[in-house]
A protein has these predicted regions:
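Glycan-recognition and catalytic cores of secretory/periplasmic carbohydrate-active enzymes
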Residues: 1-257
Length: 257
């Protein structure tokens, strides 16, 4: 992974991967966890440089990419920042704290909560000229749900928990989170008042909601709805291997993105 990062065409832009922006946040989140679990510090400077370079106005919404980013793109960097805060990843003098960067993402996404359609929810993409503006998807809403839950647990501020519950409750009124069978649809559209759904199944959608539910379960001291979800989501795991399979994954096929 680091060989690819160091050899990329965009290597003069710290934190930017070729052809994609959000995956840089995902990569740094993995490297932060790697440092925490192994004690290996060799990648820490690259993580710090990339995270701070892409922080924009302390909200991971840099002007160079803001015209085409989606809410899901931004939230991955917020999740990387809250991971750094939780694991006490080293900060650099003169730079904002990791938790403040995670809060910056939360503070810019909450005003985008859209009650003009579907009685709530985050749109996938932010600007009306983007193709995904009419879509409300699981990873954007699940991402903000998880970030809110983690900020609640980390800071003790109940406002974050209230937002996590609001996102959960709204998701459950749409195909994005079906409490009857715990199916998580990839997307729904404002044109259909969020009653239709995209049938694609992606494991990161499930993982985002499951992780957020686990943080909320800890925050509210074993709340029944979140326990219920955590218990039944385990049914989706393969009994033989305990691996969560994505029905639409293609075996042995990988790309840079």
């Amino acid at each position: 992974m680091m060989n690819y990062y160091n050899d990329r065409d965009s290597k003069l832009i710290p934190g930017k991967l070729d052809g994609t922006w959000w995956e840089g946040g995902s990569m740094f989140m993995i490297l932060i966890q790697y440092w925490f679990l192994t004690g290996d510090t060799q990648f820490n400077s690259a993580v710090q440089e990339g995270m701070y370079w892409q922080k924009g106005d302390d909200d991971f919404f840099p002007t160079n990419y803001s015209q085409y980013l989606g809410n899901d793109d931004q939230v991955f960097w917020g999740l990387a920042a809250i991971t750094a805060a939780e694991l006490n990843f080293p900060e650099k003098d003169g730079q904002p704290s990791w938790v403040s960067l995670a809060q910056g993402v939360f503070n810019t996404q909450v005003p985008r909560w859209d009650t003009s359609s579907c009685q709530g929810g985050l749109r996938w993409q932010i600007w009306p000229y983007q193709d995904g503006y009419g879509t409300k998807n699981a990873i954007s809403n699940g991402g903000l749900f998880q970030l809110s839950a983690r900020l609640a647990l980390y800071t003790g501020n109940h406002t974050y928990a209230q937002w996590a519950e609001r996102i959960w409750d709204w998701s459950a009124t749409t195909p994005l989170l079906k409490e009857k069978n715990w199916n998580i649809a990839d997307s729904t559209t404002t044109e259909a008042n969020c009653k239709d759904h995209g049938d694609w199944q992606w494991t990161y959608n499930y993982a985002t909601y499951i992780s957020g539910a686990a943080y909320m379960y800890n925050y509210v001291r074993h709340s029944f709805p979140f326990f219920f979800f955590l218990f039944f989501s385990s049914v989706s795991l393969s009994p033989s291997s305990r691996i969560f399979h994505s029905p639409h994954s293609i075996p042995s096929t990988c790309t840079d993105h």
